[in-house]
Amino acid sequence: MSRAVVFSVLSNSTKLQNLGFTSGYILPNYDGYQRPNISINQNNPFFMVLRWGAQRFDPRFYRGPRTLDIWVHMAREISTDYSRIDAVIEIIDPLLTGIIDTPGADGQSVTSIEMMGRSVDLEDPVYQTLCRNASYKIISRNTTTGAE
């Protein structure tokens, strides 16, 4: 499924780190019940949640693409300017689509990642944030057992 490759690329991006996406601000698959403490520091109003979706199998290959939605959240008490969220997504797009045949620490290698689209501007009443998501199609393979 290649979670490790994606998480590593996002976590190690200097551009994202400069926007405040450090440890604890990239949440794997609804990791936290409360939003990170983003409202204290106006230089760090963001966090993101990685939501792995369904995988559609092709019976000829016993595998298929899996969807990944990356939700970028911004504290609405700091800003209501969605262009700040758009700028984060613009950084994420080339990071992910540039991953080709990359092995991960979880025994999965990413074969390719394609952009699929972006959501409308949304509000999250639970996290009390403004947010958007970007969707990606990920093709990966298991590299620990030699399976293709």
Region annotations inferred by a language model:
Residues 47-48, 68, 113, 134:
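A broad, low-specificity signal marking well-ordered, structured residues that form hydrophobic/aromatic
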